From Swiss-Prot:
Organism: Bacillus subtilis
SMART domains in the record: CBM_3
Name of protein: Endoglucanase
Domain of life, source organism: Bacteria
PROSITE patterns for the chain: CBM3, GLYCOSYL_HYDROL_F5
Length: 499
């Protein structure tokens, strides 16, 4: 009998060990309270999110990608795994309005309801996210928003785990006082008729970065918070300064979206910068939600391509971002290492290496061609291999097909390469960049590439509005500029990328 027991125990241990990457479930032990059972109804006290006992609470979790694209990852099984294995206390369901979202595909709302019902059963908080993005002004679909939030608040107004996010990322020619605040007042009024208590989060200008503007003209509702969004590879101390200003004005902040990547969603990951951000959020007890739960082949995704859609993920199923985020939600010491990439924009660039000079071949504000002329100069003491160097000219293509011609290059037009890149998330003054490179050649210390004259045009030859383009300025002589950025093997070495 003892021998049989010994054999059984040995087999059991072998079985457990061979499960290898299967992860422990810290929240699944019998008797563990769910986040909602533990904290109950949330409210605002000063700038702080607090639970039913008035104690500060910091929610941590993850956001879906667009429900219309990656909705299969949003289900009770996956959310249960995230609660039990990752330790999430909040899940954000990102329901796009445009881009195949609810405006054109009303059935997406059913996936939102599925997410809320699953969160209710699992006892986690859930953010109902009206995910405006390419439709940058929330007023564009205001009546649809009011209709949607009327329905959601009537269904879930007595459910303490529901949080409403009524405008994901206002952007473009939008400001707080004229556009966002009046919109928010109308939508909040609709929600409050059915739900007097639950938290409402309002997006801020410039893709939810301008919390300072919202802080200067605050909404009157006692349980409203302002959304702050950041991507660790793009946004640094300048954005934390905005957050500090908002807090000093008594405006509560909820980070409903942040990524370990750059703002495109697909550069990085930037783990050192992410650690700096999370340390800051912890110091202020600011709640956060990471972007995103999907297997999309980009660096901000938490899962590797082909990962299960219902949870049960091994460590080997998680991306570098997913591994980092899971460990930081759990509060364990992360063991991940940075993947070398472009550094954060607020890091100092190399001043004594190569630089770029620019002049406008066509200074017209409205023209059917953009004609940048530039030359790259080696200010350092060592020879530069040009095949490792690329330059980016940042501008607005407005979703039109792009073409480029080389009119003249001292190094030879045949030695110059080009690539157009559309940004995942438009930046201030740019939704596209033209990347210029070289097939071969070197730059000795003190040498220059000489003049490179380019000409861009739309497929339909329609006009550009250059005045709003990040890299453009009107000059008929060459001037040094940091708004055309330079890279050595993909690493930023000169200039400042747009916000």
């Amino acid at each position: 009998m003892k021998r049989s027991i010994s054999i059984f125990i040995t087999c059991l241990l072998i079985t457990l060990l061979t499960m290898g990457g299967m992860l422990a479930s810290p929240a699944s032990a019998a008797g563990t309270k769910t986040p909602v059972a533990k904290n109950g109804q949330l409210s605002i006290k000063g700038t702080q999110l607090v639970n039913r006992d008035g104690k500060a609470v910091q929610l941590k979790g993850i956001s879906s990608h667009g429900l219309q694209w990656y909705g299969e990852y949003v289900n009770k099984d996956s959310l249960k795994w995230l609660r039990d294995d990752w330790g999430i206390t909040v899940f954000r369901a990102a329901m796009y309005t445009a881009d195949g979202g609810i405006i054109d595909n009303p059935s997406v709302k059913n996936k939102m309801k599925e997410a809320v019902e699953a969160a209710k059963e699992l006892g986690i908080y859930v953010i109902i996210d009206w995910h405006i993005l390419n439709d940058g002004n929330p007023n564009q679909n205001k009546e649809k928003a009011k209709e949607f939030f009327k329905e959601m608040s009537s269904l879930y107004g007595n459910t303490p785990n529901v949080i409403y996010e009524i405008a994901n990322e206002p952007n473009g020619d939008v400001n707080w006082k004229r556009d966002i605040k009046p919109y928010a007042e109308e939508v909040i009024s609709v929600i409050r008729k059915n739900d007097p208590d639950n938290i409402i989060i309002v997006g801020t200008g410039t893709w939810s970065q301008d919390v300072n503007d919202a802080a200067d003209d605050q909404l009157k509702d006692a349980n409203v918070m302002d959304a702050l969004h950041f991507y660790a590879g793009t946004h640094g101390q300048f954005l934390r300064d905005k957050a500090n200003y908002a807090l000093s004005k008594g405006a509560p902040i909820f980070v409903t979206e942040w990524g370990t990547s750059d703002a495109s969603g697909n550069g990085g990951v930037f783990l050192d910068q992410s650690r700096e951000w999370l340390k800051y959020l912890d110091s202020k007890t600011i709640s956060w939600v990471n972007w995103n739960l999907s297997d999309k082949q980009e660096s901000s995704s938490a899962l590797k391509p082909g990962a299960s859609k219902t949870g049960g993920w091994r460590l080997s199923d998680l991306s570098a971002s997913g591994t980092f985020v899971r460990e930081n939600i759990l509060g364990t010491k992360d063991s991940t290492k940075d993947i070398p990439e472009t550094p954060a924009k607020d890091k100092p660039t190399q001043e004594n290496g190569i630089s770029v000079q620019y002049r406008a071949g066509d200074g017209s504000m409205n023209s059917n061609q953009i004609r940048p002329q530039l030359q790259i100069k080696n200010n350092g003491n060592t020879t530069v291999d040009l095949k490792d160097v690329t330059a980016r000219y940042w501008y607005n293509a407005k979703n039109k097909g792009q073409n480029v011609d080389c009119d003249y290059a001292q190094l030879g037009c045949g030695n110059v390469t080009y690539k157009f890149v559309t940004l995942h998330k438009p930046k201030q003054g740019a939704d596209t960049y033209l990347e210029l490179g070289f097939k071969n050649g070197t730059l000795a210390p003190g040498a220059s590439t000489g003049n490179i004259q380019l000409r861009l045009h739309n497929d339909d030859w329609s006009n550009y509005a250059q005045s709003g383009d990040y890299s453009f300025f009107k000059s008929n002589t060459f001037k040094t500029t940091k708004k055309i950025t330079l890279y050595d093997q993909g690493k930023l070495i000169w200039g400042t990328e747009p916000n």
